[in-house]
Amino acid sequence: MNGHSDEESVRNSSGESRSDDDSGSASGSGSGSSSGSSSDGSSSQSGSSDSESGSESGSQSESESDTSREKKQVQAKPPKADGSEFWKSSPSILAVQRSAVLKKQQQQQKAASSDSGSEEDSSSSEDSADDSSSETKKKKHKDEDWQMSGSGSVSGTGSDSESEEDGDKSSCEESESDYEPKNKVKSRKPPSRIKPKSGKKSTGQKKRQLDSSEEEEDDDEDYDKRGSRRQATVNVSYKEAEETKTDSDDLLEVCGEDVPQTEEDEFETIEKFMDSRIGRKGATGASTTIYAVEVDGDPNAGFEKSKELGEIQYLIKWKGWSHIHNTWETEETLKQQNVKGMKKLDNYKKKDQETKRWLKNASPEDVEYYNCQQELTDDLHKQYQIVERIIAHSNQKSAAGYPDYYCKWQGLPYSECSWEDGALIAKKFQARIDEYFSRNQSKTTPFKDCKVLKQRPRFVALKKQPSYIGGHESLELRDYQLNGLNWLAHSWCKGNSCILADEMGLGKTIQTISFLNYLFHEHQLYGPFLLVVPLSTLTSWQREIQTWAPQMNAVVYLGDITSRNMIRTHEWMHPQTKRLKFNILLTTYEILLKDKSFLGGLNWAFIGVDEAHRLKNDDSLLYKTLIDFKSNHRLLITGTPLQNSLKELWSLLHFIMPEKFSSWEDFEEEHGKGREYGYASLHKELEPFLLRRVKKDVEKSLPAKVEQILRMEMSALQKQYYKWILTRNYKALSKGSKGSTSGFLNIMMELKKCCNHCYLIKPPDDNEFYNKQEALQHLIRSSGKLILLDKLLIRLRERGNRVLIFSQMVRMLDILAEYLKYRQFPFQRLDGSIKGELRKQALDHFNAEGSEDFCFLLSTRAGGLGINLASADTVVIFDSDWNPQNDLQAQARAHRIGQKKQVNIYRLVTKGSVEEDILERAKKKMVLDHLVIQRMDTTGKTVLHTGSTPSSSTPFNKEELSAILKFGAEELFKEPEGEEQEPQEMDIDEILKRAETRENEPGPLTVGDELLSQFKVANFSNMDEDDIELEPERNSRNWEEIIPESQRRRIEEEERQKELEEIYMLPRMRNCAKQISFNGSEGRRSRSRRYSGSDSDSITERKRPKKRGRPRTIPRENIKGFSDAEIRRFIKSYKKFGGPLERLDAVARDAELVDKSETDLRRLGELVHNGCIKALKDNSSGQERAGGRLGKVKGPTFRISGVQVNAKLVISHEEELAPLHKSIPSDPEERKRYVIPCHTKAAHFDIDWGKEDDSNLLVGIYEYGYGSWEMIKMDPDLSLTQKILPDDPDKKPQAKQLQTRADYLIKLLNKDLARKEAQRLAGAGNSKRRKTRNKKNKMKASKIKEEIKSDSSPQPSEKSDEDDDEEDNKVNEIKSENKEKSKKIPLLDTPVHITATSEPVPISEESEELDQKTFSVCKERMRPVKAALKQLDRPEKGLSEREQLEHTRQCLIKIGDHITECLKEYTNPEQIKQWRKNLWIFVSKFTEFDARKLHKLYKHAIKKRQESQQHNDQNISSNVNTHVIRNPDVERLKETTNHDDSSRDSYSSDRHLSQYHDHHKDRHQGDAYKKSDSRKRPYSAFSNGKDHRDWDHYKQDSRYYSDSKHRKLDDHRSRDHRSNLEGNLKDSRGHSDHRSHSDHRIHSDHRSTSEYSHHKSSRDYRYHSDWQMDHRASGSGPRSPLDQRSPYGSRSPLGHRSPFEHSSDHKSTPEHTWSSRKT
């Protein structure tokens, strides 16, 4: 192939002289490595490359080599580059480019996967040589350096040669490789797919070509394999200069792409700058890839800046290539290679300079911290170069005997997989290759007929650990873990699903994996096993499976849609046998919910749920989803047995054994009285299902745990803030039990923040401190706890302890991190924002042998469950949780198996504050309220509480909250303002001595003791008594006594002042004031405002002036249990569904709120819906326009918690999607059979798309929401996986096309519903209907108003304007359809008019369709006013009705004037008449109205223009007709202007009428009137100036009032008259503004009240809501682009639709409706 010769030429030119062993070895080492680094087999290569290549590739290669040599000379001259040198210097080439070949290979491979490749082999064999060369090239470059190192002459290039071979032979053959989906990410830099055929090369290109021609071809193949991920590489075409012959593959390659772009396509693209350095000159390019360095050594090794001159080099990750192909480059080499993405270099430099500047001025601690972060990042990047799994291979082997492998990289998602050269991977990761092939050939894959699934075997206990458990390292289970395994096995044999509830740290993960291993080996049950785990523990599960059960194939099902699709493609099932490949599937809750239909389709042999307390709420979506999965056995794994109630325990039992524990009521009745009588019966019932061991029973070797409560005073600043918070909230506090719970909770949160640190209340300004020392001192002095912690940490550091510090508040962790940096204590941090891989690294770094890390900061609740930090021996709980269970778990992270030292736990509590009281109460309350499963035989004794408490609630009621808030307040207020004492200086040893201390004893003494132990309280019964005595005393005092009056007064005065300022300040000043008062640093300001969702009048809240405008419509307490982020997600998902309140499960799934109960979700949903309705009602006075600019309509908004909701938008989305909700069956089985009831027009996608696909798309939108295209693609039941969102971004349908299509289909459904409704209401027969038509229509119109309204609402997405091409396509569609129509319509006795619904309606002899030729002529003539045509039906968003009318009028005048101009070239009246008609028909395609109507409207507009210009009434008096309307508006009179009889005759003669009736009776019987009502009614219907409902719209809108008998009078007037009129029009242009005032008035006068009442929803901002006149049938249909886009809904500006119109619309194919109008 061309590729070959190119390659050869490259080789020769580079001095390799290998003639062209295209097949691979030569090329492999050739382009880069052999020439430059000759590491591979360089000795033989460089000299004998010719011979090598000759021998390998044979005659083919020789002939090619000749050509290539000639080419070489030509190419090599201009750049005069030595190939090897250049190779080194241009890393981007480094990744061999195999573009053409790759492509071919891919195509072939694709085929191969289906055909097993045999045909392709033959077909591609010709090209294979060539391809292989290309492949080789690629490999050569990269791998060569590395791999081939001694491979010898023929294959000497090792990777290259293989790759070449790959490329060559396999290029053709490889192309068949089964597994390479076209669009996977490739690992090497993919060359561009298309090679230009032009033959011209620029110097740069040539240069590059020299080195990489071989590679490139190679790349091409790769490219295919890899997908188009990296389309840019070298700008050289490797085929062009070669022979002129082209094979079919080449043609294929080019035809899909734009040939002109090819050149750019061939350049490599920079994806990312990873690092920079000063390096040795020339130490760049391919020789710096990781594999080249391993083979040849690092060209930069031993470089010292001081001794030699260096240059700045950048480590570059190339787009489309994996990280092993990263190279070091200089700016110069990048420019030489003409790479794309150079803008990134500037950005990187800028950032780098900023960092350097910062480092210069930063303190040593900061620098150290920065360096640690860098180190972590570098470690992460190193992992990206390790192959974690191989998931596919190519069919063809390269010369070196290796296929290419599709690799998944460690730490990167599946979407980053890439194709790599086989030899390269084999050299480094042979173990992964072996694993891959053993997985592929494994016989131990799941099969349905496993007999133990149907009948469980007898249980045989395992006396000792079986050899298959423990993996290659022969790890041993502890005795209690073996017991646990036996218990799990016993439960399985008995058919009992169960709960493993061992305390944290006892190895539940290992026991579960051993159990699966037991099923696998003992009972040949190979799966599929589903493990659902939290993201935070996913990596540790993966690691443990690898360690303990390496024989089982575990796949991690995670990542974005691309990653998950790739897993389905490569890791899911064997394509031939259709048997599943994996044994274990690991996934997270979120992914499970996203892909529930896919994952739920499998029959699982086992489902295990880790951290199963997520399932304690049987009303949550996660619970409901998972319980529906088909499974043979279920296991719940939880370290925190049930926290709050018996109901939660029942939920878990019901989940595992729904038949046995079917009813909560029965369960409660049986065991609810347990508290009085003990729980013996419950224990007995639980025994088979629940296993709970605690550490102290099973792990005697575990060292003791000692906990101390350290109480400290507040600092002076804290006291001040604490009092301040209470004083400012005096009003709320004094309400006592009448106050709101959420109000108290918010105040309490503020006080808790204050107890932790003052910065949480008011962060300091950025420039507040002069130096680090001062900042550190201020930081410490702002919190009593931190003063103590500082002393404690210094002492612990001296002793060599390692510390875990827990806080609930992430912002507190920020402050602690800042403190640790000032103190230069090395630390790690983990909170919710730290993602999987970084999190894992931080843990590994902390636990590593000899780790320097002293502290680990953790948030109490962040995904830390199951995290092992046993290398720490001290735990500091900075602030206690409401729920002591969470603190227990926090402690367990250090006090767990593997711990060798005593664990000290320090709990910090602020004396005399809410914190202390919460702790006291929690001790007592939690013992009673929390279900603690103690040891009872295996299960432990239980303290159970029957009530079901809502998950989000706090454990305290209002009275208790009020009492807690009073605790300590009185003492505080005794210190005068400004004289608060600093806490006394105390020695840390003294503090520790005084602390309340308790060690854990071997076994609990009293019931609930384990829970109590954390509080160090010996006996809780005394506590209860104290409690009773204390309560009255504390509660008796009220807030007036506690807060001094002087302070209350001062606060009230301040508030009054603020209110006055608010009143007198201008809005702009007010805003400035707000900003100023919101002090300092931007970042902190936002933080300080964000009060954990609190709406209380807390300090900063009060400092801010009150917001103007309406008060918040919804009090905050209504949304307990939802954070602002969750509410935002909920609203976003809410807008995706029709009837969202009936689809809460789908909304919650989409919003990832599956843990919430349906009750909570319903409450929030109703809050959103009702809030929107109310806001729209309140705002019915009109739209608020943002910033006064047109186009931006900011509808009424309201707030839910901190989230602003656009009411209009939400309601409009709800209404737009309502037809879909009504049409799609809710029953899943019926839904599978759903077919769209309307005829649809062709989609014009790049794939076959039919009615079935439309139906599936609608079902997908129903199930997953509008816009969730990727979810729809993933659902196998919808069969759209291969059809939508193709990987090639240039292929349709992508998201934009799907949106357009969906909008169109939903409109069809809407019309269909309206039609059915109209039919339902139609009832009586024709004759009756005809007589009473007007009355009936009126009634129907009002009845159906609601139905139809949704028609006019904006579609969920606003489309961008369609471009000219689309317009042309539409025009063509119309033409072809018109042709079809003319064929289909039977001849009628009477003249007919073809309506948009393709129903014949008789009119006169004239037809309103244009033949193709006329249409084209009209199109050309009207091109100058194309813009006006497009805008005719599409007013800008946000215009008022008056402005919309004006807009349409102006467009009509422009269009009409242009038509008048066009007609001037004719003299023959007949011609003029004919062309006027043709042009207006053309115009009618752009709007709802037909040609006559438009012409008439135009004439009225002209008259108005004349009238406003001339201000004289002469015409009026002469033209008034008998039915003059007595309306003060002069314009109204105008509209009945000179109509002579001829005009009446031509449009609405009696003859026409009778024909119409006859025709109608004969042909259409019952449907007749509907037809006539449709969009183009017979014109007789207008003879009285009224529409089919007997409504006279022109009465309402003077502009268009006219006697419709006198239609088209212009056609019959003399030419003089016309020219006169035109003259007037021209004169009057520009004076049209006079109209607007009166129009508006008239408009509103005649507006019915019902219309106003609906003003709030966006669909009601209609265009001309009063003209109900003459709407064409497709009005509400997906008429035209204009229609879809108008925010005012699908109705044209010119009218509502009647139910009849709807009904007729859909009588026949909507396809015609749509396309006949759309041009």
Swiss-Prot record:
Residues 1-10, 66-85, 239-248, 1369-1380, 1526-1576, 1585-1673, 1698-1710 have a biased composition (Basic and acidic residues). Coiled coil: none annotated. Its EC number is 3.6.4.-. Belongs to the SNF2/RAD54 helicase family. Residues 184-207, 1103-1113, 1327-1342 have a biased composition (Basic residues). This is Chromodomain-helicase-DNA-binding protein 1. The keyword Ligase does not apply. Residues 117-133, 161-178, 212-222 have a biased composition (Acidic residues). Residues 268-360, 385-448 form the Chromo domain. It comes from Gallus gallus. One of its GO terms (cellular component) is chromosome, centromeric region. It catalyses: ATP + H2O = ADP + phosphate + H(+). Residues 1410-1512 are annotated as: CHD1 helical C-terminal domain (CHCT). Residues 34-62, 103-116, 149-160 have a biased composition (Low complexity). The lineage of its organism: Eukaryota, Metazoa, Chordata, Craniata, Vertebrata. Residues 788-939 form the Helicase C-terminal domain. The 2 chromodomains are involved in the binding to the histone H3 methyllysine at position 4 (H3K4me3). The CHD1 helical C-terminal domain (CHCT) binds DNA and nucleosomes. Residues 1-249, 1076-1116, 1319-1393, 1503-1719 are annotated as: Disordered. A motif (DEAH box) lies at residues 610-613.
